[in-house]
Amino acid sequence: MLPRLVTRPMSAKVLALSVGGASFIVFSGAIPVQASSGPALRPVGAAPAVPAGARALGPGRASERLTFDLVLRPRTGRRLRAFAAAVSTPGSAAYRHFLSTAQFAARFGQPRAVVASVDAALRGVGLAPGPVSANHLVIPVATTVGRARVILRTGFERYRLASGRLALANTSAPRLPAAVAHLTQAVLGLDNMTVAAPAATRRPRDRRQASPAARAVPAVIGPQPCRAAVRAARRYRAWTYNQLARAYSLTGRAAQGREGAGVTVGLFEQQPWRASDITEFQACYGTGVPISTVKVDGGAGRGPGPTAETVLDIETVIALAPRAALDVYEAPAGNFAKSSLDEYTRIVDDDQAQVLSTSYGVCESLVKLGAPGLIASENTVFEQAAAEGMSVFAASGDTGSEACEQSSKRLKELSVQDPASQPFVTGVGGTDLTAIGPAPAERVWNDARFGGGAGGGGISSVWRMPSWQAGPGVVNRYSSGRPCHHARGYCREVPDISASANPERGYAIVYKGHWIGEGGTSAAAPLCAALLTDIISGLSPAARAGFLNPLLYSLPKGTLNDIRKGNNDYTRTHHGRYPATRWFDLASGLGSPIATSLAEALRRPS
């Protein structure tokens, strides 16, 4: 559904915006501020929408510290997009000829002279820019609310949100010197209205037990659990990781016995975690995966709330790729737009990880309203990731075809989640794995009856269907160009692939010293990342697979498990949209992975 603008009698030129039955407040026009002499100023972006139920508390305190990002446009955006696609497409002359971060900056980042001129212009109006990012595209700027009010010509308002959280937001688009505005893609971090939700879901009415002492059990196949994990799996009807490995054919043949050796996995996190949980889990599985923690913008802090998200991601990769290295990146959840971009930028600029998994996201329409400019800025970073050969997996969300419902129960319109819908990201949906083999028995995960969640999937309202998204089932009776305003074609469809996600048959993990069962597409995404890690470690030598989707959509029949049962209409308000069908569908994508088949495809010369 497209946003519907309606006017209401409010002060200071305020518009009420209605999206899918929920209201947001948008300030139109800047609150008058002190005028200052200097260069001509131009607006960049827009003010964030304020969710209905938020209560204004008055102007932001002038002394409050504020740090925002000035995001520069890539030097040649179209060429970057073309290169990112070519380097990822089998048969292309550029296939797998990846760049380093320095090469990317030299080719697609802004030149040093341009960055220096932007720095000088910002200092000239009284701002304090920091060092540009390694890709030459992000400049952090430190100031105060009072100075930003005057320099950027925007008001700042404090709010108490319906959740009780305090927030700050600019009330109009920031204004920058014209020469700087021309080079700027977005200004991120002037507000903290939006918080990303991790797509981790616990088994309803879950009960925890104290962790018994870890003891080894005889090896069967893949990573081997201790008795504590086996007992927990039985109690919570959860899978142990050796069972998951078997379900997706993650055997010695797929990984050539290397189990992730020589490969680094990056994890995007915004939740705190306890090292003692990981120590206990590694003792159970007999692993010794080295973990490096990289704090971005000060680290995760307390996070938006207690969840098992980070340990779920870490333990999944540890168990399924036990000889890989693991880099856990952490950023605070409070300033969603800035923290997310800073963290993705740091991961890709560091260029240490060959594979990246993220389980965080927000539905596209709420990102567009609450964090204007973030989706486009993320896209540039994911194009950079593809150019550097980094494979990115993102959870598609746990509220089925109604992604916005994860943020508000009132938002039941058809929607998908960012960043899973990004055109240079592999979106991972959810299945209900009921038997492990020899061929796994799976259907689309949808626990609508008991409110346990459903695998995210549907049609993007932002992105057009990429050229690589083609093949049987891709253009179907639900395909449309309307959501993304594409009059002559179709919009991007997600997910791309799926894996076990039902928390009723979740993953047995250690969290806060207890064994629990955890699921969601937050489990499926790191599972797929670990699976690819094992596969590329078995290549000779260990290599980067790069952005995986062009290869995935070109694979022949039988390379993935085709999911043909169920639908992801989580709220039961869309007549079963979207159902699983033969071939690709909007509930499970291309299906779930078969590691041995994918390994063979990646070993073929192109």
Regions found by a protein language model. Name each.
Residues M1-A35:
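Secretory targeting and sorting signals
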Residues I291-S292, F393, G427-G430, A435-E442, ...:
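Acidic/polar loop patches that form or flank catalytic/metal-binding clefts of enzymes
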Residues L531:
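Walker A/P-loop NTP-binding active-site region of P-loop NTPases
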